[in-house]
Amino acid sequence: MWWRDLTRLRLWLKREAIPGEGRKAAKVNAGVGEKGIYTASSRGGPPSARSKAVTVVAEGAASRSWLSMDAPELGPGLVERLEQLATCPLCGGSFEDPVLLACEHSFCRACLARRWGTPPATGTEASPTACPCCGLPCPRRSLRSNVRLAVEVRISRELREKLAEPGARAGRRRGGRIPTMGCLDLPGEDMRKTWRRFEVPTPKSSNSEDDLPEDYPVVKNMLHRLTADLTLDPGTAHRRLLISADRRSVQLAPPGTPAPPDGPKRFDQLPAVLGAQGFGAGRHCWEVETADAASCRDSSGEDEDDEESHYAVGAAGESVQRKGCVRLCPAGAVWAVEGRGGRLWALTAPEPTLLGGVEPPPRRIRVDLDWERGRVAFYDGRSLDLLYAFQAPGPLGERIFPLFCTCDPRAPLRIVPAES
């Protein structure tokens, strides 16, 4: 039920907002399931005004921490990401009566009706309908209500309303900092205090995604709602690249490996390959496991040395140059980050930008494409910390494809399946 999901989400947000508490605080909060209780209406409905959800925790857990009132976001932009997940790609607003297509994309029912037009009269031939995001044929009869997404929209709205309350920025002490407890509130205290940990944002979450409560998959589902199920397009791969049988990993082929014939869509100098799926609207995410790899700014396709591996991951426009030297920057229709020498660089012009504090580069990189906003952002795939974001002045204007570039036969780049 949605109110139970909301209660659990509140609990997880409270734990995420505790900086510096480390594993000890995480374990204290995660243990509420054993020593804590929740009270709700006896008939299983949502908590009423007379029966609010109250959490009781074991004694001795009241470690005190100080949280800043001036941090811009909750964790690494958690609330903003939840709102993005609850946004219709057609109208740009929160989902209203969301429906799910056969291709797993969701839209407002009214927005989709306007896009597809009026249904044909009975007895006449129906005009073909397709998904506005991926273009796959989706008959009208395949529409079904997305109840789970509707619940997530409601959770997102309530979070935003709570963060917008005047009390969220009241009660400043000690130069803009207020005391909060490292444990949950005791029974009988004002319920507004149970919101304080996400009313008072923290600049960085200390817990990784893998540390989320195992019995609460809704949070992971919300963060991964836009994760695309990608495969590689062998027809675009440089002839020296080796694509796996499942088309989810790529590496430089060992010497002596037979090369496929050249083609008009292949990169002939840059050791790169594009994803088979392109996006011309909406928001889409994918994750890449880099292992020890990192990208090759030398687009000659030759190894620069035998001791250092290279990779680049990101996105490229359909118009990206396939033959000759490729401009690895937004002006060349490429938005990517590069790992080399144990460091991570954003491929900007005229020179790449070193991303300080990202050493060594994360083993998983999450690419977040927002086509309408013209934004391509990169996150640590496990902590979800923002690494870098490219921002165009408007929509990207063409179909965008995932981009993978590697110069190492020992460390392949692997697409993380959407369900991982």
Curated annotation (Swiss-Prot):
GO molecular function: ubiquitin protein ligase activity; zinc ion binding
Entry annotated with the keyword Disulfide bond: no
Recorded superkingdom: Eukaryota
Keyword Cytoplasm tagged: yes
InterPro entries: B30.2/SPRY, B30.2/SPRY_sf, Butyrophylin_SPRY, ConA-like_dom_sf, PRY, SPRY_dom, TRIM/RBCC, Znf-RING_euk
Localization annotation: Cytoplasm
GO biological process: innate immune response; negative regulation of cytoplasmic pattern recognition receptor signaling pathway; positive regulation of cGAS/STING signaling pathway; protein K63-linked ubiquitination
Pathway note: Protein modification; protein ubiquitination
Gene3D superfamilies: 2.60.120.920, Zinc/RING finger domain, C3HC4 (zinc finger)
Region (Disordered): 246-265
GO cellular component: cytoplasm
Catalytic activity, reaction form: S-ubiquitinyl-[E2 ubiquitin-conjugating enzyme]-L-cysteine + [acceptor protein]-L-lysine = [E2 ubiquitin-conjugating enzyme]-L-cysteine + N(6)-ubiquitinyl-[acceptor protein]-L-lysine
Positions of RING-type zinc fingers: 88-135
UniProt feature coiled coil, ranges: none
Residues annotated as domain B30.2/SPRY: 210-420
Keywords: Cytoplasm, Metal-binding, Transferase, Zinc, Zinc-finger
Major subcellular site: cytoplasm
Known function: Plays an inhibitory role in anti-RNA viral innate immunity by targeting the adapter DDX3X and promoting its 'Lys-48'-linked polyubiquitination. Alternatively, enhances the cGAS-STING pathway activation by promoting 'Lys-63'-linked ubiquitination of STING1, facilitating the STING1-TBK1 complex formation and STING1 activation.
PANTHER family xref list: E3 UBIQUITIN-PROTEIN LIGASE TRIM
UniProt protein name: RING finger protein 39
Gene name of the record: RNF39
